[in-house]
Amino acid sequence: SDVCSSDLVNSLSQEVVGQPQAVAAVSDLLTIAKARLNDTGRPIGSLLFVGPTGVGKTQLAKAAAKFLFGDSNRLLRFDLNEYVNRGSAARLVGTFDEPDGLLTGAVRRQPFAVILLDEIEKGHPEVVDVLLQVLGEGRLSDGLGRTVSFSNTLIIMTSNLGVRENSQRVGFAGDAPVGDHVWVKAVQQFFRPEFFNRIDRIVPFHQLSREVIEQVARIVLNE
């Protein structure tokens, strides 16, 4: 298992540069999650990636999809900025007039997938209630009452919660590393306990150093 885990860490580190702690945390959970595929019940895992934009959160979600399902395109992405209004939850789940909800329909078509929910804190409270049901029960009913199972999905949420507090305490490149408790506290203060407690792991992403940014630029240029 350790060998498998170290191979996975190496593989993910090639995809996501400069985030060793995040890569290690996700590797642990992915190894467990892969063993839970085809288990009935809850999703195989739920992660919350916290940190500034442009530091590798989406890349790590794609790498997770590739590891679990053999294809980085097995990623169903939802930007919660687009689900801020009352009625947003109905769009995701489905209504009598449009029974195929955006989320339920996507998962019915592709039941083995990573579901990436960007900027989770922006979603309407009713949307968060829908996600709470997914995390707790592993299923939703669409507009026609058909059950959609999430038991072969990995839920990855992203958030900027805590970024402002952290940026006030560190300079460029995180010269003085901030304890991860700052991120956890920001998330815990924002969400209701029943939602917070359903998250398997909160994974902090840190501001990239100049050296890492140059390394990323070289990788992009070489592609």
Q: Model segments located where?
A:
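AAA+ P-loop NTPase nucleotide-binding core of proteostasis motors
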Residues: 1-223
